[in-house]
């Protein structure tokens, strides 16, 4: 879609494109998302995220030192009022290979889910199954989804708050049957940057409320919490994502991730690290059978002056 932009807006658009492209490139490199000869099935929903993902991947395709194919795929789930002409017209204008799949999952969901209940879970499973199957049919080696960093962090808190799990969306995922590899190239990109970029680019956004499903109130509440943090505590969101990349199982409580049961100490281990740097040599002169109050600062200083110095007991504990 053509958008008339001021010189300032053009500059801003180019700056955002460079930023997002850099983040996508780093994510691809960090997780080995794209390899020589890959055929990437880029899943388009008609939303800002998938449009931006396709746009950036096409740009990187021209710059990358490796060769890979991009095939855009949209699943038309026959939701009432879905503008079927929008995506084909846009993709034709780009000259990119694409497929529009038609499958009436909308009717299946309406038949299975009682009126008033959320349809998202079943709808998502049906959509995923169709896309996974089609990826194998066309020989796609990777399936690219448009989830960004905010989605990943929101999912972590949703699972922590409502499912009791430390689980998010991995940037790269092997399907349960091992047949499909899912990648999320926008894993390092912020939603606010993507939204601004999509507006400046004039992507033909298709509204996401066509199914008439209820808003996911849990996700909305988590998003609101994170947005508030982002305003009140700049840098906190970045810190959370960095923490997700720097986990330490031995410092946690998950027995499945670390073998706490088999932990044993080595009584003959040499002193090193924090222990070696402390004043513990003063303990060499302590009579541990004596319940006393010991001035370690004075003891350490005295020991350095006179190695034979004995520690004076400041006070004695009497039960």
UniProtKB/Swiss-Prot annotation:
Q: Name one GO molecular function term.
A: sulfurtransferase activity
Instruction: Quote the CDD domains the UniProt record gives.
Output: TtcA-like
Q: Where found, per UniProt?
A: Cytoplasm
What GO biological process, any one, is recorded here?
tRNA thio-modification
Q: Identify the residue span(s) of motif PP-loop motif.
A: 45-50
Q: Give the pathway listed in the UniProt entry for this protein.
A: tRNA modification
In terms of superkingdom, the source organism counts as: Bacteria
Pfam families given in the database record: ATP_bind_3
InterPro entries, A to Z: Rossmann-like_a/b/a_fold, TilS/TtcA_N, tRNA_Cyd_32_2_STrfase
Q: Which family does it belong to?
A: Belongs to the TtcA family.
Concerning PANTHER family, the annotation shows: AMINOTRAN_5 DOMAIN-CONTAINING PROTEIN, SULFURTRANSFERASE-RELATED
User: Can you name this protein?
Assistant: tRNA-cytidine(32) 2-sulfurtransferase
Biological source species: Shewanella woodyi (strain ATCC 51908 / MS32)
């Amino acid at each position: 879609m053509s958008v008339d932009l001021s010189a300032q807006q053009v500059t801003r658009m180019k700056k955002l494109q460079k930023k997002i492209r850099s983040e996508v490139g780093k994510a691809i490199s960090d997780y080995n998302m794209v390899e020589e000869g890959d055929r990437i099935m880029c899943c388009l929903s008609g939303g800002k995220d998938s449009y931006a993902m396709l746009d950036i991947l096409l740009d990187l395709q021209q710059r990358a030192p490796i060769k890979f194919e991009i095939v855009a795929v949209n699943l038309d789930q026959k939701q009432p009022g879905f503008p079927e002409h929008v995506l084909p017209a846009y993709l034709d204008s780009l000259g990119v290979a694409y497929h529009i799949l038609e499958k009436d999952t909308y009717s299946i969901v309406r038949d299975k889910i009682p009126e008033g209940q959320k349809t998202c879970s079943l709808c998502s499973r049906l959509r995923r199954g169709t896309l996974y199957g089609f990826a194998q049919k066309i020989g796609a080696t990777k399936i690219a989804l448009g989830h960004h960093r905010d989605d990943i962090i929101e999912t972590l808190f949703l699972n922590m708050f409502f499912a009791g799990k430390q689980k998010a969306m991995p940037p790269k995922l092997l399907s349960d049957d091992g047949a499909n590899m899912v990648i999320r190239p926008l894993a390092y990109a912020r939603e606010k940057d993507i939204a601004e970029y999509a507006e400046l680019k004039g992507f033909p956004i298709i509204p996401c409320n066509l199914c008439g499903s209820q808003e996911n109130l849990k996700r909305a509440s988590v998003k609101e919490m994170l947005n508030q943090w982002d305003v009140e505590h700049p840098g906190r969101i970045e810190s959370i994502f960095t923490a997700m990349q720097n986990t330490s199982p031995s410092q946690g409580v998950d027995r499945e991730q670390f073998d706490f049961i088999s932990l044993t100490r080595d009584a003959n281990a040499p002193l090193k690290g924090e222990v070696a740097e402390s004043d513990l040599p003063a303990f060499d002169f302590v009579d541990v059978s004596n319940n006393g109050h010991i001035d370690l600062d004075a003891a350490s200083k005295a020991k350095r002056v006179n190695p034979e110095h004995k520690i004076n007991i400041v006070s004695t504990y009497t039960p």
